[in-house]
C-alpha cells in the first residue's frame, strides 16, 4: 500500500524546550539502528540560538513517527526495544520516508541561556506493510557552544566478549564507548549533568550478561543504565546521593545490582524485573563506614571496601531479613581497589609507617578469601598511589598513578614483574588511574590492558602477549581537543597544580624510581585518608581549604603558600626554580578548592529535615559548637584565636580548629582518629572541653549528628 505524497512530514517544535525540570544528560550520534532504521544528528550538543538537525533513515515509503521524551525507559517489544518513556513523550514529526529512505527535520533552538543543559531523548518507529521497526535511541543536550574544558576520565569497564570498552568522564558527564578491536571511538554518550563534582569518584561496570553498563556518580541522585547492544541510555534509576560503586549477582534468585551507598552506610540491592527495569528491593546495612568498593566473591558473598573504617567487610546478599554481616578484615588503610582471581583477593593500598621517618609503603595485599588470611604483600613502592588494579589468569596489572607507571606481573608464580612507563616518549608523565583487562573480540584470555590517563585524557593499551618487555599501542585521545593534554603545557595554573598535587614529579620521583608519596596519597580526591600517621595526627581533608586559614593541625601556616612550602620541606622538596614554580602551581590549585561536596543528607530541595533543624538549634545554642565552628565556613570567628587547645578524652593538644564542611565524609574524627563516628565524638566529650554536650540526651545528640551530616 502506497502513501499519499500529499501527506508531508510535519515537524513540531515542542514546548518542552522550556521545561526547567528536565534531567541534564547528553547523547551522541547513532552508530547502528535496532532494525533497519537509523537516527543521526549533526551535533550531540546543539547550542542555544542554533539550528539542530535530525536525520531518519529506513525503508523507502515506510510510515514513521518520530517522538521525543524527557526521560528514558527501556521496554522490550516484538519489533525492538523502546527507550522513550510513554508517560512524558511527545510527537516531533510524522510522515513517510522518501524514495531514498530518508527524512530530515530541523529545530530552531531559542537563544535562551537558561536552556543550557536541558536534555531530550529521541526515537522513531515505522511500519512498511506488516513490517514494524524501531530506530536506535538518541539523546541530545542543549549547550552554550562546542564542548570544551577538562573531562577527567576516571573509570573504565569492558564487556566480557571484548567488543566494547566504556570510559566514564568525571567532569563533563559523558561516557566514551570504544571498539577495542579497531581502537575507534564509537560514541560519546552523556550520563550526568555538567558540572559534576570532580572531587568524587565515579564507577562504571558491565553486568555478567553483557546487556547493560551501569554508571554511578556520587554527586547525582541517579544510576545511569546503558543498553549495550544499541548504545542507548536505557534508564535513569533513582539512587541516593553519594553512591560510589557497583557490583552484580545474576543467579537463580534473579538479576541483582548492588550499589554502595555512603549516605546509607549500606549496600542497596536493585532487582531487574522485567528486562531493563531496575527497582530497589532491599538495603543491606554495614557495620563499617565509608563503602567505596564492591566485589562479588566466589562463594556468593559480597566484599565491601570501607574507606572510613579502613577495613573490608563481607556480607551475605541473600540474607535480607537478618544481619547480612559475615566478617570484617582490618586493613589499617584504604582498599583502593578490589581485584579477584578465584578465591584470591588483591587489594592495592598505602600502608602508613608506624615510625617517624619513612612515610609508608605502596603495596598490593593478597588475601585468601576462604580463610581471610594475608597471603603476601607485593610491589612495595615499585610505584606510587596504586589507585586501580585488574587481574586475569595470565596477568595482574596495577596502576602506579602518581609515578606515571603501570606494574604488570604473572599472578601465580610471580615469575616476572615489569614496571611499564606509560609515556616513555615524553616528560612529565601522566596519571594512569584506571585499568581494564580486555580480551580479543569474541572473548578469551585478555590480551591487552587498557589504561586511562586522567590528566592526559587518553586511553592506551599495553599488549600483554609475548611477555616483558611489553609493547604500548598508540594513545587514543579522549580530550575535546582531539589530542593528549600535556600535563604542564596544556593546563592552566590551577590545573597544573592539580596534576602536581597528584604526581611525584616535584618529589623527584620517576616511573622507575618513585617517591613513596604524592600529595594525593594522604589527600586522595581532596578527602582525608582516615589514616593516623606515626606523628599521631590524621591527614586533614582539603574541603574548602582555600577559605580556612590557618593551616596544618598546629595552625602554624598562616596562608596556603606557607603551607605548601612546609609540605614540600616535610617531604624533602627544597630549592630550585622548578620546585618554586611547582609550589606556586600547587598553591593555586588549593586556592581553587572553595567548596565541599554536596551533602547527601539534605532534602532534595536543599532544606533540612526536622531532626537536622533541631540539631542546628543545639549547634548554635545549648551545645556551644558555633563558638569554635562558626558558619558559613564552620571555623573560629575572626575575633577568636585560630588555634585553640581542645581535649576530647584524648589529652590536651594544641589543635587548629578544622572546618566542619564535609564532615559527613571524613570519619574517623578528632586529631588522632579516636572517634569512629560523629556520635562517638560527642560521647567522648564527657568533660565538655569540646562544646557543651555531656548534658544532651540521646535524642538531642542524634539531632545534632543529623545537622552535622548536612554540612
Indicate residue ranges for each PLM-predicted region.
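Periplasmic c-type cytochrome electron-transfer domains
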Residues: 150, 297, 334-341, 350-352, ...
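Predominantly soluble domains enriched in secretory-pathway, periplasmic, or organellar proteins
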Residues: 143-499, 504
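Bacterial N-terminal signal peptides
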Residues: 15-28
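Bacterial Sec-dependent N-terminal signal peptides
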Residues: 27-35
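Short basic coil micro-motifs at the edges of alpha-helical modules that engage polyanionic partners
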Residues: 112, 236, 283, 328, ...
Amino acid at each position: 500500500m502506497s502513501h499519499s505524497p500529499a501527506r508531508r512530514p510535519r515537524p513540531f517544535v515542542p514546548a518542552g524546550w522550556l521545561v526547567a525540570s528536565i534531567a541534564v544528560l547528553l547523547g551522541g550520534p547513532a552508530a547502528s539502528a535496532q532494525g533497519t532504521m537509523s537516527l543521526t544528528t549533526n551535533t550531540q550538543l546543539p547550542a542555544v540560538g542554533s539550528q539542530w538537525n535530525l536525520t531518519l533513515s529506513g525503508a523507502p515509503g515506510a510510515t514513521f513517527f518520530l517522538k521525543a521524551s524527557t526521560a528514558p525507559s527501556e521496554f522490550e517489544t516484538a519489533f525492538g526495544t523502546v527507550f522513550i518513556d510513554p508517560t512524558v513523550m511527545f510527537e516531533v514529526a510524522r510522515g513517510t520516508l522518501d524514495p531514498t529512505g530518508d527524512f530530515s527535520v530541523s529545530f530552531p533552538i531559542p537563544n535562551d541561556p537558561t536552556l543550557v543543559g536541558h536534555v531530550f531523548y529521541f526515537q522513531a518507529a515505522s511500519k512498511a506493510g506488516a513490517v514494524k521497526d524501531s530506530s536506535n535511541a538518541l539523546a541530545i543536550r542543549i549547550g552554550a557552544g562546542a564542548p570544551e574544558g577538562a573531562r577527567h576520565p576516571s573509570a573504565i569497564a569492558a564487556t566480557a566478549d571484548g567488543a566494547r570498552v566504556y570510559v566514564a568522564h568525571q567532569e563533563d558527564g559523558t561516557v566514551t564507548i570504544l571498539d577495542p578491536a579497531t581502537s575507534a571511538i564509537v560514541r560519546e554518550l552523556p550520563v550526568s549533568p555538567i558540572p559534576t563534582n570532580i572531587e568524587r569518584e565515579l564507577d562504571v561496570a558491565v553486568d555478567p550478561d553483557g546487556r547493560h553498563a551501569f554508571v554511578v556518580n556520587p554527586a547525582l541522585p541517579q544510576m545511569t543504565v546503558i543498553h549495550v547492544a544499541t548504545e542507548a541510555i536505557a534508564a535513569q534509576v533513582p539512587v541516593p546521593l553519594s553512591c560510589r560503586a557497583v557490583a552484580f549477582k545474576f543467579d537463580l534468585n534473579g538479576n541483582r545490582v548492588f550499589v554502595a551507598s555512603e549516605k546509607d552506610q549500606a549496600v542497596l540491592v536493585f532487582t531487574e524485573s522485567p528486562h531493563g527495569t531496575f527497582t530497589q528491593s532491599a538495603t543491606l546495612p554495614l557495620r563499617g563506614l565509608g563503602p567505596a568498593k564492591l566485589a562479588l566473591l566466589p562463594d556468593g558473598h559480597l566484599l565491601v571496601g570501607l574507606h572510613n573504617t579502613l577495613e573490608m567487610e563481607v556480607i551475605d546478599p541473600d540474607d535480607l531479613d537478618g544481619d547480612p554481616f559475615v566478617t570484617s578484615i582490618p586493613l589499617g588503610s584504604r582498599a583502593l581497589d578490589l581485584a579477584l582471581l578465584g578465591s584470591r583477593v588483591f587489594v592495592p593500598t598505602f600502608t602508613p609507617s608506624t615510625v617517624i621517618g619513612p612515610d609508608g609503603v605502596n603495596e598490593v595485599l593478597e588475601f585468601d578469601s576462604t580463610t581471610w588470611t594475608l597471603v603476601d604483600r607485593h610491589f612495595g613502592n615499585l610505584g606510587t598511589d596504586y589507585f586501580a588494579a585488574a587481574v586475569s589468569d595470565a596477568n595482574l596489572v596495577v596502576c602506579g598513578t602518581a609515578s606515571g607507571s603501570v606494574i604488570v606481573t604473572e599472578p601465580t608464580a610471580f615469575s616476572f614483574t615489569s614496571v611499564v612507563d606509560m609515556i616513555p616518549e615524553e616528560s612529565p608523565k601522566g596519571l594512569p588511574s584506571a585499568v581494564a583487562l580486555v580480551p580479543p573480540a569474541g572473548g578469551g584470555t585478555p590480551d591487552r590492558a587498557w589504561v586511562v590517563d586522567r590528566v592526559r585524557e587518553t586511553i592506551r593499551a599495553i599488549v600483554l602477549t609475548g611477555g616483558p618487555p611489553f609493547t604500548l599501542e598508540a594513545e587514543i585521545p579522549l580530550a575535546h581537543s582531539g589530542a593528549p593534554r600535556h600535563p604542564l603545557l596544556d593546563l592552566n595554573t590551577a590545573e597544573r597544580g592539580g596534576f602536581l598535587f597528584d604526581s611525584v614529579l616535584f618529589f623527584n620521583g620517576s616511573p622507575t624510581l618513585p617517591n613513596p608519596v604524592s600529595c594525593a596519597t594522604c589527600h586522595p580526591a581532596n578527602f582525608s585518608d582516615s589514616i593516623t600517621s606515626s606523628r599521631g595526627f590524621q591527614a586533614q581533608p582539603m574541603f574548602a581549604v582555600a577559605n580556612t586559614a590557618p593551616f596544618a593541625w598546629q595552625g602554624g601556616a598562616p596562608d596556603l603558600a606557607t603551607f605548601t612550602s612546609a609540605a614540600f620541606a616535610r617531604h624533602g622538596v627544597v630549592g630550585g626554580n622548578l620546585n618554586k614554580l611547582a609550589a606556586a602551581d600547587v598553591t593555586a590549585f588549593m586556592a581553587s578548592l572553595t567548596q565541599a561536596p554536596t551533602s547527601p543528607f539534605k532534602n532534595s530541595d536543599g532544606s533540612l529535615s526536622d531532626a537536622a533543624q533541631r540539631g542546628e538549634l543545639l549547634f548554635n545554642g545549648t551545645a556551644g559548637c558555633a563558638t569554635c565552628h562558626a558558619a558559613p565556613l564552620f571555623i573560629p570567628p575572626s575575633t577568636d584565636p585560630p588555634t585553640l587547645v581542645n581535649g576530647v578524652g584524648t589529652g590536651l593538644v594544641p589543635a587548629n580548629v578544622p572546618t566542619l564542611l564535609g564532615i559527613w565524609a571524613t570519619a574517623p574524627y578528632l586529631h588522632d582518629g579516636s572517634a569512629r563516628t560523629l556520635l562517638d565524638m560527642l560521647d567522648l566529650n564527657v568533660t565538655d572541653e569540646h562544646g557543651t554536650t555531656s548534658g544532651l540526651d540521646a535524642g538531642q545528640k542524634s539531632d545534632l549528628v543529623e545537622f552535622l551530616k548536612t554540612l
